[in-house]
Amino acid sequence: MNALEEILDGVRADLAVRERETSLAALKQRVERVPDPRDALAVLRAPRVSVIAEIKRRSPSRGALATIADPAALASLYEQAGAAAVSVLTEQRRFGGSLADLDAVRVAVDIPVLRKDFVISPYQVLEARAHGADMVLLIVAALDQPRLIGLLERVESLGMTALVEVHDETEMLRALDAGARLVGVNARNLRTLEVDRETFARLAPMVPQGVLKVAESGVRGPRDLLQYAGAGADAVLVGEAAVTGGDPRQFVADLVTAGTHPATRIAH
């Protein structure tokens, strides 16, 4: 069993518990009470390389990363630093996240919020909207094609934006075939947990005009952002480096400054 399969086993077990605790009807009632989702695509289309900054306590590859007692405060720092969006990990077993983190972040910031999890069910999509998410991660490697298409349609039917994550050429073709408008290229292979920063440059040329590209994993600082920008990235998603560097606000601010560098506009 590879790393992704192990994570998905835990996700299914935890999902079954939540489905017993909170009915679909209750989730739908909650959706009716939350504010409309923000337009993440409009934000990420800005003439720069945008920064999506992540609330991340743990990872399967590194274990414990940071003690984040107040995710709302960290999200506010990210927003003050100029982040275009905040990513909130809600998977508990391997990443130490929760839907409570999503709730806290949603009320703390005015920028789009991404629910980052291993979404395999329409229930989780409705759950994301009920807890205020504007964006939902869909990982192609975790889904067959009919399920990917169905979940993407469900995300968009609720007014949210799907960030469709891929790791290789086959997955990129599947994402585009499903109708993804925002594609994330993860430099980390979720099956082996190894990072290859050349993955983005290899896959980006496959993406047609009008589909936005996010570089995920491997962003250690402005130099990596500029490298991804040169390969056509519209945004970068950064988690580990932001929470382990000691000054998350300054780290994100430095990335935001790099993202507005004239060289990034030339790359686009």
From Swiss-Prot:
GO biological process, one term: L-tryptophan biosynthetic process
Cross-referenced Gene3D superfamilies: Aldolase class I (3.20.20.70)
Alphabetically ordered keywords of this record: Amino-acid biosynthesis, Aromatic amino acid biosynthesis, Decarboxylase, Lyase, Tryptophan biosynthesis
A GO molecular-function descriptor: phosphoribosylanthranilate isomerase activity
Reactions catalysed, as given in the entry: 1-(2-carboxyphenylamino)-1-deoxy-D-ribulose 5-phosphate + H(+) = (1S,2R)-1-C-(indol-3-yl)glycerol 3-phosphate + CO2 + H2O
Enzyme class at the top of the EC tree: lyase
Taxonomic superkingdom: Bacteria
Pathway membership: Amino-acid biosynthesis; L-tryptophan biosynthesis; L-tryptophan from chorismate: step 4/5
Record InterPro entries: Aldolase_TIM, Indole-3-glycerol_P_synth, Indole-3-glycerol_P_synth_dom, Indole-3-GlycerolPSynthase_CS, RibuloseP-bd_barrel
SUPFAM superfamilies reported for this sequence: Ribulose-phoshate binding barrel
EC numbers for this chain: 4.1.1.48
Record-stated family: Belongs to the TrpC family.
Database matches in HAMAP family: IGPS_A (MF_00134_A), IGPS_B (MF_00134_B)
PANTHER family: INDOLE-3-GLYCEROL-PHOSPHATE SYNTHASE, TRYPTOPHAN BIOSYNTHESIS PROTEIN
Protein's name in the database: Indole-3-glycerol phosphate synthase
Organism: Parafrankia sp. (strain EAN1pec)
